[in-house]
Amino acid sequence: MAEYTKVKSTKLVLKGQKQGKKHKHKDRKRKATDEDEKPDIVGGWWVVKSFVEMNGTVALEMQNNAYIHALDSGLFTLGAPHKDDEGPDPPEQFTTIKLSDSRIALKSGYGRYLGINSEGLVVGRSDAIGPREQWEPVFQDGKMALLAANSCFISYSDSGDIVANSKTAGDEEMLKIRTSAERETRSKDDLAEEDRGNVKSCEVNYVKKFQSFQDRRLRVNEGDSMTLKKARTDGKFHEALLDRRSKMKADRYCK
């Protein structure tokens, strides 16, 4: 366990990565953005885009409509492709257990945890979570791969097994993690409601949130808001707001 905890969060090392051509036309950019934002959902199973979304039951899609399939022998293979509107079969569904802010464990329908053996073969025969049963989903540039405890990415071998043998992530190591968990509708920027709008409206929002209304009057700092605009650009917006509120001596969280 100690050896594995030393492994740092990983970025994808892509094989033969090429930079895409830039589209100067605004309409083309807008079209590409719209396509990127279109949810990838198959039979109620949607693609996970970040670690935060790793919840509940998941399926690992390694090719179009083909998922990692658990065998009763404790081994895994790539299942037969499904129809475009068809989700994964029960042997292709796994339970997610979050172990940290970056690592998970996966439990098959046979009640065993996915891990790797000394040869890098993915197996599901353990009834407990040890160092070999820990996985790190790696997200980068809209792509995703799954890192095993041996610091290798999983892929599908010529012999029909699921293995973790590659230190770099190429097309064969790319996969999609799909989940059937209920989706949370969030705004694209994921900003708090108090942080929306211009700097003055944001300041009013925070004053309403934190001010002690002893005489039921809203006290807002009348100083120049240009300092707030600069602070927002510099990433010190909340510090600046707190400083302005503290000068008004009306915030129960300030001096």
Curated annotation (Swiss-Prot):
Binds to mRNA in a sequence-independent manner. May play a role in regulation of pre-mRNA splicing or in the assembly of rRNA into ribosomal subunits. May be involved in mRNA transport. May be involved in epigenetic regulation of muscle differentiation through regulation of activity of the histone-lysine N-methyltransferase KMT5B. This is Protein FRG1. The keyword rRNA processing applies. Keywords: Actin-binding, Cytoplasm, Myogenesis, Nucleus, Ribosome biogenesis, RNA-binding, rRNA processing. GO terms for biological process: muscle organ development; rRNA processing. CDD domains: beta-trefoil_FSCN_FRG1. Its main location: nucleus. A motif (Nuclear localization signal) lies at residues 21-31. Signal peptide: none annotated. It comes from Takifugu rubripes. A motif (Bipartite nuclear localization signal) lies at residues 232-248. The keyword Cytoplasm applies.
